[in-house]
Regions:
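Short, polar/acidic, helix-capping and beta-turn segments at strand->helix junctions
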Residues: 1-156
Length: 156
């Protein structure tokens, strides 16, 4: 898939980008030269609410993975709002996926695949997949199941 088709691919997939507003005093994104840094995003829904719950307690791993996909859509929403087009993204550089889970839960990468698979659908398997960390946490803000940070390379 040609990277220039990212906006059209989002439309073809029938995906809606949720409205995202920062929940604190920080910048949701920062451009520095050819790089775009995105602050941690939670799983915002279309009605501006957040998906909540701890994976392995209130949420299954499948529900956690869907929450990570929703966090990915929130990241895309911030890109579009601040950069104008998903086609400005050359490639995904790095994701940091944080999973709010019970101590016994060990499938953090499976959860964050929800976001990684979304980005691969949007920008293709080469440009849509970067390096990644997927780690477990004892809690996250507002009891969200996932929070994901991202770094992208922009076309100059």
């Amino acid at each position: 898939m040609n990277i220039q088709d990212a906006d059209k691919q989002l439309e073809r997939l029938g995906l809606r980008l949720p409205p995202v507003e920062p929940k604190g005093l920080y910048k949701p994104c920062l451009m520095d030269g050819k790089y775009l840094y995105l602050s941690g995003h939670g799983p915002f829904q279309d009605d501006k609410t957040l998906i909540t719950g701890r994976v392995g307690k209130e949420l299954t791993k499948e529900e956690g993975k869907l929450a990570a996909r929703q966090a990915g859509l929130a990241l895309l929403s911030t890109i579009r709002k601040n950069v104008g087009s998903l086609n400005r993204i050359k490639r995904v550089i790095k994701l940091l996926g944080m999973v709010n889970c019970v101590p016994e839960f060990e499938q953090h990468p499976y959860i964050i695949n929800g976001c990684s698979e979304l980005f691969a659908e949007i920008w293709g398997p080469d440009n849509g997949v970067g390096v990644r960390s997927a780690v477990g946490f004892g809690s996250l803000p507002d009891n969200i199941p996932v929070e994901i940070e991202a770094v992208f390379e922009l076309y100059e």
